[in-house]
């Protein structure tokens, strides 16, 4: 297993820098290392299901931990923003969020049958004119031209069928997932297109009014969030 010293872990990891000298790194996958946590760290340090890697490998090999409804058996599997972790044996479900300091944290959910929120990062035209939607968690699904980049989708799990389409537009509710306003939620009041190499910006009104770059904004609902926010934070 590939490891790194705990003092060098990415800032987005909420795992403390004390205790174990070495932590496992994430394997290349649906999320970058900077924006994900290894499944092994989650089940050992956060959920405290196991005491060591050997125990972790055993419960994963037995299919006791699901990510987005699929059993994952790799301690280094990357778990990122809005991913859903389910523990069927104890009927517990968690969603990965990002706090105001940009750190990833698990929120415990009351329901076990939950949906997944994803942002459309890109669109690809396939042979025959079919449109493929490339989502922020690495998922690729077939769609149509009614969907635009930066729109969000609510997907059922584990089949990832589109349940609802949320447009990236003024008036919709959004969460900021980067920069100094990370973790804040508010209504989009303006989308400012910059005709240069600089980033487009988005004005948001929440507890305060602020502006952030477009890439940091993910639509989470229209009048209300389409995914449950809050809940017990597991640290």
Swiss-Prot record:
Database matches in CDD domains: KOW_RPS4
A Pfam family it matches: Ribosomal_S4e
Organism lineage string: Archaea, Methanobacteriati, Methanobacteriota, Stenosarchaea group, Methanomicrobia
Family: Belongs to the eukaryotic ribosomal protein eS4 family.
Keyword Metal-binding annotated: no
Disulphide bridges, residue numbers: none
Name this polypeptide is given: Small ribosomal subunit protein eS4
GO annotations of cellular component type: cytosolic small ribosomal subunit
Record-annotated S4 RNA-binding domain positions: 37-100
Keywords: Ribonucleoprotein, Ribosomal protein, RNA-binding, rRNA-binding
Domain of life: Archaea
SUPFAM superfamilies: Alpha-L RNA-binding motif
Keyword DNA-binding: no
Protein's GO biological process: translation
Gene Ontology MF term list: rRNA binding; structural constituent of ribosome
């Amino acid at each position: 297993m590939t490891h790194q010293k705990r003092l060098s872990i990415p800032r987005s990891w909420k795992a403390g820098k004390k205790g174990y000298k070495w932590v496992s790194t994430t394997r290349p996958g649906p999320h970058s290392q900077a924006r994900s946590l290894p499944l092994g760290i989650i089940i050992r340090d956060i959920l405290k299901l196991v005491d060591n890697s050997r125990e972790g490998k055993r419960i994963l090999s037995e299919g006791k931990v699901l990510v987005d409804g699929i059993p994952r058996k790799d301690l280094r599997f990357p778990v990122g923003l809005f991913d859903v972790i389910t523990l069927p044996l104890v009927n517990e479900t968690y969603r990965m969020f990002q706090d105001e300091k940009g750190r990833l944290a698990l929120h415990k959910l009351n329901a076990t049958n939950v949906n997944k929120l994803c942002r459309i990062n890109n669109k690809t035209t396939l042979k025959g004119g079919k449109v493929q939607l490339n989502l922020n968690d690495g998922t690729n699904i077939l769609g149509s031209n009614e969907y635009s980049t930066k729109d969000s989708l609510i997907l059922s799990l584990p089949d990832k069928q589109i349940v609802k389409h949320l447009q990236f537009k003024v008036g919709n509710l959004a969460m900021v997932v980067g920069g100094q306003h990370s973790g804040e939620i508010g209504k989009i009041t303006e989308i400012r297109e910059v005709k240069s190499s600089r980033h487009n910006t988005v004005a948001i009104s929440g507890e305060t009014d602020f502006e952030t770059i477009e890439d940091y904004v993910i639509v989470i609902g229209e009048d209300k969030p389409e995914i449950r926010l809050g809940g017990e934070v597991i640290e």
